[in-house]
């Protein structure tokens, strides 16, 4: 019987252990996509307690707690921090088999140093006090944890109208060695069907000093904001394409669509597709000219529980996997961007694992320009961010493309404790390659495979995003 979560956790062959301990473990972290609040990094936020850093805003935990029968008051409601933590501690023993069980104990181990102890109602008091004592120390501030975890770069997620003042504050501090850069997330600028679209256009008009009436006005406003982001070091964009749409339109059609929507009219599905296509194609060309990377997160079905959406708002654990077809429309969108050789470096993520092979083969259609891995099939995302999901994504990438050119893991997280997800990924990667070697499916060449592992863990992302590190 193998003990739980030793130093060789998940490393079930000697070759996997060598790969992890000698090549993967000490690689820095290049976290190119996350949802950390830049204000907390700028202010070097000190966390009040373990709830503040660990449970606050974590919809993964809330979903598990609700499933365990925990009342909403103890998830997102007005209960005390300690009450909410105790509700989580009572839920953890029920999460065996869920990645939350592994994540929880990896996060207690690093950075808190808690090993050989499982979170449960019996241990809750001891773990609460031990972690809170550590959180009072300088090394456990927002910046302190990032430095402890050997983070070199994080890409936050930012709206085009954001001032980026916190990124500017961070950049001025030469004593802080982690590169914290904004990522451009323009969803509100192309989700024309949303009830908030006209209000958002007014905000965009104000911050860009542009009167937005025609499609060219929108392009002018967005160009000004792209320049603003570029001035703050931005090299990455991100888009939530819950459904992939494609429909071409003339400029006069786009002007009419925008004008009617700003006047409060309801658009047809075809008109919505025309507008979104035009914005994404134009943005893609802008990214290509600037040398940026674009990311498409495809296939979320959001806000399914309308009652809870009205009570609590978005992003609180009521989203799931969509099953809309995506191949043909995505192909048309990428091909349109590529017509004038203005398809930027692109990372595609799918929420439905059914679509893994679709994306794994789609990226092969648009590789080239002498750039290794220009088109990427992104790491297992959200509900696939677990052992089986990561294994499937990497196996299919290896079979359909080049695993050796993969840009690797990202946290996609709102928590400063999520950096151990990089460790989890690295262990799974080394386990997978070690099993190939054990089965005679890959050569037992530690130099060859060790270098490949180092590249996937850090070097490929560093080179792909072309961001100068401290």
Swiss-Prot record:
Keywords: Isomerase
InterPro entries, alphabetized: Metal_Hydrolase, Uronate_isomerase
Pfam family for this entry, one: UxaC
Class of enzymatic activity (EC top level): isomerase
Gene3D superfamilies the UniProt entry points to: Metal-dependent hydrolases, uronate isomerase, domain 2, chain A
Lineage top rank: taxon: Bacteria
Keyword Isomerase included in the entry's annotation: yes
EC number(s) reported in the record: 5.3.1.12
Pathway: Carbohydrate metabolism; pentose and glucuronate interconversion
GO MF terms held by the record: glucuronate isomerase activity
Reaction(s) catalysed by this chain's protein: D-glucuronate = D-fructuronate; aldehydo-D-galacturonate = keto-D-tagaturonate
Keyword Glycoprotein attached: no
Entry's Gene Ontology BP terms: D-galacturonate catabolic process; D-glucuronate catabolic process
Family: Belongs to the metallo-dependent hydrolases superfamily. Uronate isomerase family.
Protein name: Uronate isomerase
Protein's organism: Cronobacter sakazakii (strain ATCC BAA-894) (Enterobacter sakazakii)
The gene coding this protein: uxaC
